[in-house]
């Protein structure tokens, strides 16, 4: 075969080997690349690919590897059996048993995901783990695989050994399914305890000595109190979706459950984010935990380009529409995937049409790959999500939505529509998007600017992955300017406002701020105004969203004081309202001047108050009382302003003096002054203790300049600088600390590692988190007094509350005596205690009781007669014939509904008596003579 040129052209059959180089791009990290287990492959046709003059054997190995990858790309591991599937891949190196490896292969897993690769070895070592992973990243298998490996088989000793707590019924069912599939080949017993199921059935399940309990916190605590369960046998505890557990108000239940667990347990906590409440819970319930998170969770991609638009509050909806229409160029109407689905649905024959199960995308052949229109919009509250969803639907876009309190099934459908391409826009809150593993996006729009820099990183981290370009667009109001400046300090990037630097801006390295073009923005705002006038539902949604925004503004975190001061100067500058450099090619110099004039008119603030204007128009003289009052107020304000300016000039003078000293030092270096002879004598290997101290050393050692108060403070200070340990950090450069705080979370010290990973998200409907202050009393209209709000929040309104073992308040209805009544009804004696051997008699009694309780359908009914006028006539006719055949083929006994021919002794005695009476009657002589 002739030599082929070494070019970046696509290989034969359009085969992409990047999948072999980078496993799972969406969750990639800085770990070492996975080692592929070599297996004998079929010999590929020899190809001369001698790029660097290597040996022919190496080239043949590469060709065989590519051929094997190409062959495996066209098959699905879950559909193959036997030795055709790769046995476990990286799972083999984790020391798992053969049954578990076979179950993993049968499940379709070939290579562990990044979160599995990081957590499973640590869990196998017996350490407590706090793992940060989104839904869809394989975290369920990350804690189920080590659990099955540790438990191995069913224990004859009484007591559950594994406990998995999930926030919802759906997630618990999903976890049970994974446990069942990976537990094949073992005799481990697993039970599901969720709300809505029968308590009596769950009593029997817990009495059957299960090994693994998968439950929701509320129902498990109910059973713990009702059955007086002893949890001392539990060795493996998992809090799945822990942040959602606290968000849903399970903090008291988790505290009570945690109190009853033994101290020698292994505790795992998996969460999408790490709020402060969860950090406190982990410190209290986990022993020296290890924080594991991926680098993609904490870094902004260098390929991400950020754009910040300065807008007014009344123009936010119009700005969003302008970005979608003019910047992203998003089309309206149904998407290509929706049209393809409709065409495939219309082309099918009705007779051969088979109903597709929800979530089965094979019939449509969707590809969860991003398009240039895939956009996610972040809003503050769920009311904003509803409002924006209705507004964008009215504009003709294909939209999906999700928020925290949305039903689990509805949220799954909405997110799946976005992943499959049935919608181009997904409107979400931070709480809802926190645990969703969304594929790589093209654009992210921050409709409401985040209150923390880490939330911004969490939002935009979903785009610009795997070497792809991505854009983020943020709408910044005047009130959001301090938060934007905090973000700029956090990222350590240059701030560019308007066109002050001309065309020399880099959206990937700078924080570039500017306004939208006035013409397009005005058109979009007019359309929004028209829609609000015509659509009463959308108008009411906007009113509700406005009320929710007021509450959101009161509860969000405050920006730093320095950023708030800087924001006043930034917002008041002319460049704040200048057209963004992104629109450089959209207008001439005349158009720019027009934009500046309109911006000045829009930002005009009169110098006179309403009192002065009113008096001047009515021709009144200056001696009026209102004018005198305004003059006195203005004089006071001017005096304070001058005093503040003098203080700023003094601080600038001090800074100039310090910078001048640095400049002199730099000049000395530049002039090439010769060093002293003593310095030349110092060898390279000897440390130079007399070298110039760094700024950080000076900052730690010496206090900063504080004007004239320094002498007074030092004289009155009681601190001995040699022995005194301050409670504040020695470094006061908060911006530098924050910037360096974004690092990988594999530190051994959980306190230090969690400090950079902690991120509090405001609830999208005011949900209370763990250990947050709350209103303890409320006004009862009926009894005309204040009553405790505790009963309203824990779902036990109108019931008594009692103290649990940990001191937390729980509903007294948890101890209702239903378990004792059930045990007496089943005629069960003393229940075995934890640590005792389970008795076969108890298992037999439980199985018998369960069989006796469950109704078994034994009655057979004849099918309905076939109707010739119905479409299922042939089907019903066959059913009837089959039922007749079953009746005729029964051997022994009567047909269904027939009378039994077996007679009892009473029946025989009665029959004999009647027969004797008939005989006596017939034996009488005839009356006729």
UniProtKB/Swiss-Prot annotation:
Pfam families (alphabetical): DBP10CT, DEAD, Helicase_C
Reactions catalysed according to its record: ATP + H2O = ADP + phosphate + H(+)
Composition-biased stretches (Basic and acidic residues): 339-349, 639-652, 858-884, 900-910
Cross-referenced InterPro entries: DBP10_C, DDX54/DBP10_DEAD-box_helicase, DEAD/DEAH_box_helicase_dom, DEAD_box_RNA_helicase, Helicase_ATP-bd, Helicase_C-like, P-loop_NTPase, RNA-helicase_DEAD-box_CS
Main enzyme class: hydrolase
Gene3D superfamilies reported for this sequence: P-loop containing nucleotide triphosphate hydrolases (3.40.50.300)
Main location group: nucleus
EC number: 3.6.4.13
Keywords on record: ATP-binding, Helicase, Hydrolase, Nucleotide-binding, Nucleus, Ribosome biogenesis, RNA-binding, rRNA processing
Example GO molecular function: RNA helicase activity
Intervals of motif Q motif: 89-117
Biased composition (Polar residues): 20-35
Residue positions binding ATP: 133-140
Region (Disordered): 1-48, 334-358, 639-691, 853-929
PANTHER family: ATP-DEPENDENT RNA HELICASE RHLE-RELATED (PTHR47959), RNA HELICASE (PTHR47959:SF8)
Protein name, entry field: ATP-dependent RNA helicase dbp10
Organism: Aspergillus oryzae (strain ATCC 42149 / RIB 40)
């Amino acid at each position: 075969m002739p030599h082929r040129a070494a070019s970046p052209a696509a290989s034969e059959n359009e085969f992409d080997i990047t999948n072999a180089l980078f496993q799972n791009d969406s969750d990639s990290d800085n770990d070492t690349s996975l080692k592929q287990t070599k297996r004998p492959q079929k010999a590929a046709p020899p190809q001369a690919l001698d790029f660097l003059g290597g040996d022919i054997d190496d080239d043949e190995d590469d060709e065989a590897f590519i051929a094997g990858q190409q062959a495996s790309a066209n098959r699905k591991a879950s559909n193959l059996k036997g030795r055709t599937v790769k046995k476990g891949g990286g799972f083999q190196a984790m020391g798992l048993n053969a049954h578990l490896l076979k179950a993993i292969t049968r499940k379709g897993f070939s290579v562990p995901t990044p979160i599995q690769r990081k957590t499973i070895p640590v869990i196998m070592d017996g350490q407590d783990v706090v793992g940060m992973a989104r839904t869809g990243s394989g975290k369920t298998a990350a804690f189920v695989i080590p659990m099955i490996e540790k438990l191995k088989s069913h224990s004859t000793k009484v007591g559950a050994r594994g406990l998995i707590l999930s926030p919802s019924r759906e997630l618990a069912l999903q976890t049970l399914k994974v446990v069942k599939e990976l537990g094949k080949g073992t005799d481990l017993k697993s039970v599901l305890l969720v709300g809505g199921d029968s308590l009596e059935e769950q009593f029997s399940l817990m009495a059957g000595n299960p090994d693994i309990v998968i439950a929701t916190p509320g129902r498990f605590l109910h059973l713990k109190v009702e059955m007086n369960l002893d949890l001392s046998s539990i060795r493996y505890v998992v809090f799945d979706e822990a942040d959602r557990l606290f968000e849903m108000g399970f903090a008291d239940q988790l505290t009570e459950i945690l109190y009853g667990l033994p101290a020698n347990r292994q505790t795992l906590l998996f969460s999408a984010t790490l709020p402060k409440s969860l950090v406190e819970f982990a410190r209290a319930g986990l022993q020296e935990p290890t924080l594991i998170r991926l680098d993609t969770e904490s870094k902004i991609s260098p390929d991400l380009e950020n754009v910040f638009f300065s807008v007014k509050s009344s123009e936010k909806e119009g700005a969003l529409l302008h970005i979608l229409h003019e910047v992203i160029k998003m089309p309206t109407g149904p998407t290509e995937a929706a049209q393809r689905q409709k065409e495939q649905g219309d082309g099918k024959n009705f007779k051969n049409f088979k109903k597709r199960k929800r979530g089965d995308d094979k019939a449509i052949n969707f590809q969860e790959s991003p398009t240039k229109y895939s956009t996610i919009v972040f809003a503050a509250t769920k009311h904003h999500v509803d409002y924006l969803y209705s507004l964008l639907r009215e504009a003709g876009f294909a939209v999906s939505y999700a928020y925290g309190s949305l039903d689990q099934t509805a949220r799954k459908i909405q997110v799946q529509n976005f992943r499959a391409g049935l919608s181009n826009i997904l409107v979400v809150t931070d709480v809802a998007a926190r645990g969703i593993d969304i594929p790589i996006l093209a654009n992210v729009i921050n409709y409401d600017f985040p209150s923390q820099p880490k939330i911004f990183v969490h939002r935009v981290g979903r785009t610009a992955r795997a070497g792809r370009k991505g854009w983020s667009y943020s709408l910044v109001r005047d009130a959001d300017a301090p938060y934007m400046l905090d973000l700029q300090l956090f990222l350590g990037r240059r701030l560019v406002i308007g066109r002050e630097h001309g065309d020399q801006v880099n959206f990937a390295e700078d924080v570039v701020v500017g306004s939208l073009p006035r013409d397009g923005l005005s058109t979009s705002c007019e359309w929004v105004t028209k829609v609000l006038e015509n659509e009463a539902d959308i108008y009411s949604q906007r009113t509700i969203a406005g009320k929710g925004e007021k509450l959101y503004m009161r509860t969000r975190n405050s920006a730093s004081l320095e950023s708030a001061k800087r924001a006043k100067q930034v917002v008041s500058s002319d460049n704040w309202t200048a057209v963004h450099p992104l629109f450089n090619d959209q207008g001439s110099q005349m158009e720019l001047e027009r934009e500046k004039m309109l911006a000045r008119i829009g930002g005009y603030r009169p110098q006179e108050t309403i009192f002065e204007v009113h008096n001047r128009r009515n021709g009144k003289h200056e001696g009026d009382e209102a004018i005198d009052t305004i003059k006195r107020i203005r004089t006071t304000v001017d005096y304070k302003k001058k005093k503040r300016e003098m203080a700023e000039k003094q601080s600038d003078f001090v800074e100039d003096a310090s910078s001048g000293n640095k400049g002199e030092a730099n000049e000395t270096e530049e002039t090439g002054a010769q060093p002293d002879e003593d310095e030349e004598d110092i060898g390279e290997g000897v440390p130079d203790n007399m070298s110039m101290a760094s700024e950080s050393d000076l900052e730690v050692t010496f206090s900063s300049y504080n004007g004239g108060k320094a002498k007074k403070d030092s004289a009155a200070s009681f601190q001995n600088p040699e022995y005194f340990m301050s409670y504040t950090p020695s470094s006061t450069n908060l911006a530098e600390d924050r910037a360096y705080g974004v690092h990988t979370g594999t530190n051994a010290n959980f306190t230090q590692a969690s400090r950079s990973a902690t991120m509090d998200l405001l609830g999208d409907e005011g949900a209370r988190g763990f250990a947050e202050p709350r209103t303890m009393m409320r006004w009862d209209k009926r009894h005309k007094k204040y009553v405790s709000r505790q009963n309203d929040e824990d779902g036990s309104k109108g019931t008594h509350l009692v103290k649990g073992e940990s001191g937390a308040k729980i509903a007294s209805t948890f101890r209702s005596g239903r378990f004792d009544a059930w045990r007496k009804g089943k005629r069960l004696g003393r229940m075995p205690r934890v640590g005792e051997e389970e008795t076969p008699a108890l298992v037999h009694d439980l199985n018998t009781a369960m069989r006796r309780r469950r109704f078994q359908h034994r009655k057979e009914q004849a099918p309905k007669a076939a109707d010739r006028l119905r479409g299922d006539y042939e089907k019903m006719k066959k059913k009837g014939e089959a039922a007749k055949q079953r009746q005729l083929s029964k051997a022994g006994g009567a047909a269904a509904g027939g009378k039994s021919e077996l007679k009892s002794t009473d029946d025989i005695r009665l029959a004999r008596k009647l027969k004797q009476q008939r005989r006596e009657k017939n034996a009488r002589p005839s009356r006729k003579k």
